[in-house]
Amino acid sequence: MAREYPLNKVRNFGIAAHIDAGKTTTTERILYYTGRTHKIGEVHEGAATMDWMEQEKERGITITSAATYCRWQDMQFNIIDTPGHVDFTAEVERSLRVLDGAVVVFDSGNGVEPQSETVWRQADKYGVPRIVFSNKMDKVGADFFMVVNDIEEKLGAKPIPVQIPIGAESSFQGIVDLVTMKAHIWSGEELGAKFDITDVPKELEEKAHAARSEMIELIADYSDDIMNNFMEGKESTAVQIKQAIRNATLQIKLIPVLCGTAFKNKGVQPMLDAVCDYLPSPLDRKAFKGINPVTSETDSREVDDKAPFSALAFKIQADPYIGKLTYLRVYSGTLESGSYVYNPIKDAKERISRIVRMHSNNREEVKSVNTGDIAAAVGLKNTGTGDTLCDEEKPILLESMDFPVPVIDVAIEPKSKADEEKLGIALNRLSEEDPTFRVRTNEETNQTIIAGMGELHLEILVDRMKREFNVQANVGRPQVAYRETIRKVQEAESKYIRQTGGRGQYGHVVLTVEPQDPGKGYEFVNKIVGGVIPREYIPAIDKGIKEAMTSGTLAGYPVADVKVVVIDGSFHEVDSSEMAFKIAGSMAFKDACRKASPVILEPIMKTEVIVPEEYMGDVIGDLNSRRGKIVSMESKNKVQHIKANVPLAEMFGYSTTLRSLTQGRGNYSMEPSHYEEVPSQIADKILERTTRG
């Protein structure tokens, strides 16, 4: 299919922020003003186009990232609206991995909030240029310049206001564009679709000129043209200023900051213009680097329709009508429906039966997609999240994505025999969709354990099982997802020999286990020389170790952060098999861990508590009693923002305690930070509990 828009006219961007900052409301206005929808869907009415899941409509929150596309001026926008709740941070992670830019929405009354910091770090990790939309300028306490200061102080970024507000709170009318020095004023009619562009109001002239001078000084550091004009006392043109801001934004040196109120329909159109002016096209991201899976050397792909095809699968979604949808970002080349693609991770070819472009949960079938496009493919049975798809003749392996480890476990069992098979299908389908949702079996109790990022995450998934898969299940109380690791290097040897007439079984493995840095995960190293164990049996040893890691030797929790090195062994010409080496590897690993000073790890939560100052002492005392470590305290408008690291095990039921301590005036948020060794007295209680029950 011929390209509709040249690549430099394409913008792939996401809308991201803390929960309740107004991301989905902003996206709904974008769809309305670009003509993609003909009426505005409101989140609080359960009518938002992008919140299509029943759970999203009922709760008024975004749970899954939703893709859409629209046109603005002479540009094509591919947009992903992401969740703001910390339990669904994986949706943000996978979206930012494949997007070229982002609009980060802040609440003008609250500034930079905890989940905003997480989103910012994720965008930094993938080098995503961004602009900021300071939303809710109409709310009580709205302060545009507080948001600007927060971006600098809390995020360590260089904000550059390219607008200033006209009024605030109930008197917010519009914005002054500091580049053109024109005012945009909304009268409130026609749902904000029309506004007046006028001269800067007299009472704001001095403030606007001062803000513009600051803006020019800031961008002069990143533009020779602007610096020369500044030194010579010349006025820079709007075109020069926009180009300078664009260049600095693409290098993530500056962050343009705009403002408005999406709910009151003010300020959205200038923000769309800023997406065109300042965020990158696929061409601005240059050639994409990867690894050649054949040679293991660095390779790259030009951002060009004529280059060999390469794409990243970033999301899997079960569709009740057409089966499994695999969302793709095309990095190079062209993909046609009916063609075959190569998956270097799985070393398999798969056929794309259909290609669809998504508008929330609606599909529009297309014959092909080109470089820079975001679409969904039907027919890929073996492709998972983070897999590369490419041309088999010119293979490449693109950078995948990392997902956080689940922190909460829940036991689940079917209510009846009829539900048993349906539960298995549901768990398999949901874990395929969501990389932060894990399923395992407790070897001691034979219970099925599901793990996720928080209570809300698991609650939503259980609800989906009931609604989408018609599974009735009993769910236990949420438990902390403890992990086990080791504290010293240990060698172990295991022989698996069975002789029961006919062909026997023989596998012999010698290995060492070593502690890894926290968060580094599992590493497998093969140091077998001279063929003492044939090469074809090495993957079986790795598989056996991975299976053994699901249940540690201390208390049966999954093992984390361990390096395993296979150093020796032997085989039998007739009796050796993959199964024998898998069992021998598993036995050797368990034996080594048992002797390597195993310890229990617990998830630590990065917690922020916001309380009126008069309750601060009680709240800090309570956090200390929960083994919390206070990181910082900040006073803002007679309200204390307390940041602390607290073990998740101590945070169950915290909302009730906080309500009681602050007479209902406190609130808090928390997100997984890292795992730490459990203090010995707590570990003893955990071990006692697991052995008893």
Swiss-Prot record:
Pfam families recorded: EF-G_D2, EFG_C, EFG_III, EFG_IV, GTP_EFTU
One GO cellular component, as annotated: cytoplasm
Matches recorded under SMART domains: EFG_C (SM00838), EFG_IV (SM00889)
Gene3D superfamilies tied to this protein: 3.30.230.10, 3.30.70.240, Elongation Factor G (Translational Gtpase), domain 3, P-loop containing nucleotide triphosphate hydrolases, Translation factors
Alphabetically ordered keywords of this record: Cytoplasm, Elongation factor, GTP-binding, Nucleotide-binding, Protein biosynthesis
Family matches, as CDD domains: EF-G, EFG_III, EFG_mtEFG1_IV, EFG_mtEFG_C, EFG_mtEFG_II
Ranges for domain tr-type G: 8-283
InterPro entries reported in the protein's UniProt record: EF-G-like_DII, EFG_II, EFG_III, EFG_III/V, EFG_IV, EFG_V, EFG_V-like, G_TR_CS
Recorded GO MF terms: GTP binding; GTPase activity; translation elongation factor activity
Entry's Gene Ontology BP terms: ribosome disassembly
Residues engaged in binding GTP: 17-24, 81-85, 135-138
Compartment(s) of residence: Cytoplasm
Task performed by this protein: Catalyzes the GTP-dependent ribosomal translocation step during translation elongation. During this step, the ribosome changes from the pre-translocational (PRE) to the post-translocational (POST) state as the newly formed A-site-bound peptidyl-tRNA and P-site-bound deacylated tRNA move to the P and E sites, respectively. Catalyzes the coordinated movement of the two tRNA molecules, the mRNA and conformational changes in the ribosome.
Protein family: Belongs to the TRAFAC class translation factor GTPase superfamily. Classic translation factor GTPase family. EF-G/EF-2 subfamily.
Protein name as catalogued: Elongation factor G
Gene designation: fusA
